[in-house]
């Protein structure tokens, strides 16, 4: 499975419960952890932070974006960040289902974006799927 296939499948909102999807999510999580450990492990200039986040997100983020580490994600490749975005310290992005921050968006300390959901009963917890929410404007 590749990133495009995963994102297309996740958009269908069907459970992410196949072995192939599980392996892919594990690989992406490992890659994201490597970069976030590097980001969060020592001081970096704002330009260095943006460079590390660009590696993590898979595209070059705008120079106007400002992020105060530590920053956490368990996927990294389904985050879209517009111009002039500010993300304060200790934010968590579970972005398998997608997180989009439009131009000028400001995120405070300790915010959690959880875009996956699973059943409450133990037998249903392996059936991970995209979380449902209503968009607020």
Each language-model region and where it sits:
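Terminal amphipathic alpha-helical/low-complexity segments used for targeting or macromolecular assembly
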Residues: 1-64
